[in-house]
């Protein structure tokens, strides 16, 4: 990522939004002097961001560009834009809802790639003004916006026709994480979405161009970590789309997590009213936390042993919970009393609380409903169990019952 930081000429309205956290977002055009290839000066011709700064009492420095769906023919800007921005704000994340140009307005590929790259570059270049970390900028999109998200995650090095090559365009367009949500992925397979292909490619549509924008074919080892949500009952954009993208990530060693729920039609958004389907956003929340997206931290490698009454446990787990709720958790699997975590998956350095689980069979005469014992105390009445993690620790965890 480029270290270039650029002082942007931001509209007064946006500056006011930053200082007073207005309820309504500021609208910021991606090219204040006019977008390349634009046919007019209206909002449908000039792509823009709706800026939702995180509340100052919650802001953690992370940001997301949000791409509503609509088959590249419209924008579901409320439930796949505004509602998502508010959800992100609730987690301390600044949100930038992208209104990109559409095929129904006469704009076809590579215009949409140009717009999403510029959006990421704009946010990164203005990190100081937006009070965000240029190394924690994610992208999330829904349906066709999910396809645009996947293009941003796989084609960030591509230089589409129309780049202005100004200072903003010198900044990296690579997102740090990507969350394509019930996404269109393939433009060539039978499970692709024909309407999105028609609107995206327009009269220049060829099989070669369709393969070029089929993002399951564009994944490389440089693709950022990916979180995917979809439903099995989606008949508009079948689940084969995200599965193809997930498998491509696996082949290239890209960290990826996918959740496919059985019930649910296409286009559900956050769907927080459904206690089951709406839980997908909680998984995203956990994933972002454990990616270190909410708070960059130094993690530590460690190893150790876990015993109960002097006897190594047969199996179990140790969860390390940091004091900062935005910092990632760590969980070590215990087998035959031993556990080990490398620096990539270990706990954050500093004070952590321990939650230990083990087999009830390891304590003679002890029975529980599920055969498992979970405790946050080293011994009865001792209070919460905590310790200081420095790195390279060799822990000897002894539980007394």
Predicted regions located by residue number:
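Short beta-strand element of the alpha/beta-hydrolase
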Residues: 60-69
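Short beta-strand/loop motif that positions the catalytic acidic residue
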Residues: 228-230, 234
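N-terminal cap/lid segment of alpha/beta-hydrolase-fold proteins
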Residues: 24-58, 192, 296
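Catalytic nucleophile-loop/oxyanion-hole region of alpha/beta-hydrolase
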Residues: 76-78, 82-83, 97-134, 272-278
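Primarily recognizes the serine-hydrolase "nucleophile elbow" in alpha/beta-hydrolase
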Residues: 118-196, 210-211, 215
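Glycine/proline-rich low-complexity segments that form flexible loops, beta-turns, and polyproline
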Residues: 295-401
